Amino acid sequence: MIHFAHFNFNVLDLQRSLDFYDKALGLKPVKESTAADGSFKLVFLGDGMTDFVLELTYLTDRKEAYDLGEGEFHLAFETDEYEKFHQRHKEMG
């Protein structure tokens, strides 16, 4: 048997990303790992209900924005509180 484990985003500002995913979606860190040489940090965020995690990769020396190209990608969530989250996201801009 095989199951979906995680999805990854590379981020430039780890704390800003952590704050965003917490406020926007209620995702909290469930595991962290830092490279022995300090070159990168991984933070795995979970929803507290499923085993799926979002992995944020922070390359400590990276300063320029990532070129996301023209490929489409997305991360999907389900909720029975659509209006609540929609309002929160509108307020966040």
Q: Positions of the model-derived regions?
A:
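Core segments of cupin and vicinal oxygen chelate
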Residues: 2, 8-51, 91
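Compositionally biased, intrinsically disordered low-complexity regions enriched in proline and serine
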Residues: 5-7, 22, 41, 59, ...
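Vicinal oxygen chelate
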Residues: 12-15, 64-93
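Short, solvent-exposed coil/turn elements at secondary-structure transition points
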Residues: 33-35, 59-62
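Short, charged/polar surface micro-motifs in flexible loops or helix N-caps
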Residues: 48-52, 61-63, 82-83
